[in-house]
């Protein structure tokens, strides 16, 4: 006797349908996940994991406590004994850095991430601005798409103001990336904002009632998983430091550590970096950067989105501009005059709008053991940076800030402007 078709289909498809229904319920039904443990937050703060950068839950839990955003890219991963996270831990500072960034994260990613932060209003942050972000083509599509966060995009759209030039520019810029094509409603909502129109009722309902809770639940479920655990590395580094914070003593120690770890090359690059990343490529790297320039780039307008977000949240921010390893620049032909023009343009954009806390280290690239490799701060560089970070974060509450935002920084004219006359 043949079994009914319905029973056969149910046996085959029933479990799948039940699984789909359960997952949908898990994502859509409103309920609260438990708060992350202190150990998880501490691990996340130094993990530099993509799911933490793309998420909101753990970062916002940390911001409600004594964590301070340290925003940047790959330089934050150079965790020697003088890294900000190590110094804060060893010397029992009243703050703990929460590292927001990894290789490839640039201004547009940070704009969405900072925009979604809560508990940062009226507080301080530190942001490392690398000249290398400001390439002629701007952030690569693959880089941005890797860090794309549906949760952060939903937060932006639900609060976007179509009358704001900043939000209209952000929408136009975001539409240039393939990741924003993945959800038709999100794409159409971006087009509305870009055109100066508010979201339709249907778009708002979908984002608020479907997309937002689903993204929040996914974030709460998965942002705590697969965290890199850099805490043992920080603990080990902290043990190498003296118990008393004395700048001269620490500078001597940083010099000795740098000397011990840069013995196999003439550029003062860390030994393993030189061996793994540079040595076999030396012939083709010589003179390879002679035509590079960071003066003209869409990144300047992406940076303006970050500045606008800091201003909206009344945050006081210390910007750090790192140097280039001078010996390496001489070998590759990188024009350090061009670097100074880039820095001039960056500082003009910051300071004319009231972002006056700028630590310019760009001329320190020839200092011994200042850099860990070609473009990343190390040993003595971290220590010099700490001489400004430490007093800046004596209190994590922002002083009253009065920014004077200028929409000209969203224009192509500014993106392509030279640094002449900006001093």
UniProtKB/Swiss-Prot annotation:
InterPro entries hit by this protein: DltD, LTA_DltD
Pathway linked to the protein: Cell wall biogenesis; lipoteichoic acid biosynthesis
Reported function: Involved in the D-alanylation of lipoteichoic acid (LTA). Could be responsible for the transfer of DltC-carried D-alanyl groups to cell membrane phosphatidylglycerol (PG), or alternatively of D-alanine residues from D-Ala-undecaprenol phosphate to the poly(glycerophosphate) chains of LTA. D-alanylation of LTA plays an important role in modulating the properties of the cell wall in Gram-positive bacteria, influencing the net charge of the cell wall.
Compartments where located: Cell membrane
Principal cellular location given in the protein's record: membrane
UniProt keyword annotations, A-Z: Cell membrane, Membrane, Signal-anchor, Transmembrane, Transmembrane helix
Membrane topology of the entry: Single-pass type II membrane protein
Source organism per UniProt: Lacticaseibacillus rhamnosus
Record's protein name: Protein DltD
Transmembrane segments: 13-33
């Amino acid at each position: 006797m043949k079994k009914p078709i319905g029973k056969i289909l149910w046996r085959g498809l029933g479990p799948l349908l039940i699984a789909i229904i359960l997952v949908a319920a898990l994502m859509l039904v409103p309920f609260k996940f438990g708060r992350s443990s202190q150990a998880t937050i501490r691990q996340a703060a130094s993990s530099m994991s993509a799911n933490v950068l793309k998420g909101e839950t753990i970062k916002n839990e940390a911001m409600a406590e004594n964590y301070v955003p340290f925003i940047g890219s790959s330089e934050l991963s150079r965790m020697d004994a003088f890294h900000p996270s190590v110094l804060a831990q060893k010397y029992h500072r009243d703050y703990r850095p929460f590292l927001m960034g990894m290789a490839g994260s640039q201004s547009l990613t940070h704009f969405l991430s900072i925009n979604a932060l809560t508990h940062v209003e009226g507080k301080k942050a530190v942001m490392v601005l690398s000249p290398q972000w400001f390439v002629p083509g701007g952030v690569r599509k693959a880089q941005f798409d890797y860090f794309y966060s549906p949760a952060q995009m939903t937060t932006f759209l639900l609060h976007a103001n179509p009358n704001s030039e900043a939000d209209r520019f952000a929408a136009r810029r975001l539409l240039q990336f393939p990741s924003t094509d993945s959800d038709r409603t999100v794409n159409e909502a971006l087009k509305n904002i870009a055109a100066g129109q508010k979201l339709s009722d249907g778009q708002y309902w979908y984002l608020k009632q479907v997309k937002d809770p689903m993204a929040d639940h996914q974030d709460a479920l998965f942002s705590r998983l697969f965290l890199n655990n850099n805490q043992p590395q920080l603990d080990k580094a902290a043990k190498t430091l003296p118990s008393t914070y004395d700048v001269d003593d620490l500078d001597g120690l940083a010099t000795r550590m740098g000397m011990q770890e840069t013995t196999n090359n003439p550029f003062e690059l860390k030994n393993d970096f030189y061996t793994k990343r540079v040595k076999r490529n030396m012939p083709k790297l010589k003179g390879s950067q002679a035509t590079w320039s960071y003066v003209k780039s869409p990144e300047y307008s992406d940076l303006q989105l970050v500045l606008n977000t800091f201003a909206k949240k009344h945050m006081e921010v210390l910007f750090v501009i790192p140097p280039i390893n001078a010996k390496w620049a001489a070998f590759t032909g990188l024009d350090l005059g061009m670097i100074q023009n880039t820095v001039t343009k960056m500082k003009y954009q910051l300071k004319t709008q009231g972002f006056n806390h700028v630590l310019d280290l760009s001329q320190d690239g020839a200092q011994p053991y200042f850099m860990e490799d070609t473009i990343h701060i190390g040993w003595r560089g971290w220590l010099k940076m700490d001489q400004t970070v430490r007093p800046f974060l004596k209190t994590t509450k922002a002083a009253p800030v009065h920014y004077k935002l200028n929409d000209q920084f969203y224009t192509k004219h500014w993106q392509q402007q030279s640094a002449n006359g900006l001093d």
